[in-house]
């Protein structure tokens, strides 16, 4: 099916459910800042796609975040694909740096931390995150696509297990209970790796 160049925006019910839940339990305002940081992240991808001449088909807001279709990238050079895949994390990193430069502004510090966390999280080579796509792209320069996909899956699974084990060890060693947000992060890592 030929793409007509118009961006379709889809809102899944799960997006509204998660946003409502997060706003209900969040008294700090970090949930709203996280949503803004996610929009900035996807905006980075959209800007890079426009610069590289790619028209995205669809952006979907769902319970796990925001997903942007990156179809049409197959015909691009590896360098352009790398720019597009890295653009979201780059925007979050730049916003974090700008926020941390604003000394004495607590909201800016929280927004900077949220952007840094989203940058790091998306850079992980796990599942369908940007880091996994970058890893696969880099690996295909040395091995076949099939081998690159297998290596990506192994690295993603190992890293997800290490992160989950680290959370468990931290909680046991420090006598801490797992917070609801940490539980959802671990659950999201598992889901991302299983879906990919």
Show where each model-derived region lies.
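Hydrophobic transmembrane alpha-helices and their immediate loop junctions
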Residues: 1-196
């Amino acid at each position: 099916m030929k793409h007509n160049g118009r961006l379709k925006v889809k809102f899944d019910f799960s997006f509204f459910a998660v946003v409502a839940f997060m706003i209900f339990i969040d008294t700090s305002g970090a949930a709203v800042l996280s949503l803004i940081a996610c929009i900035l992240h996807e905006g980075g991808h959209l800007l890079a796609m426009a610069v590289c001449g790619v028209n995205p088909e669809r952006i979907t807001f769902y319970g796990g975040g925001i997903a942007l279709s990156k179809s049409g990238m197959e015909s691009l050079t590896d360098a352009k694909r790398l720019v597009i895949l890295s653009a979201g994390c780059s925007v979050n990193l730049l916003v974090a740096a700008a926020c941390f430069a604003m000394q004495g502004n607590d909201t800016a510090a929280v927004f900077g931390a949220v952007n840094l966390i989203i940058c790091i999280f998306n850079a992980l080579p796990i599942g369908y995150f940007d880091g996994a796509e970058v890893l696969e792209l880099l690996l295909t320069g040395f091995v076949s696509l099939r081998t690159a996909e297998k290596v990506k899956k192994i690295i993603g699974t190992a890293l997800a297990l290490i992160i989950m084990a680290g959370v468990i060890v931290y909680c046991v060693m420090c006598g801490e209970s797992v917070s609801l947000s940490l539980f959802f992060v671990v659950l999201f890592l598992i889901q991302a790796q299983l879906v990919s």
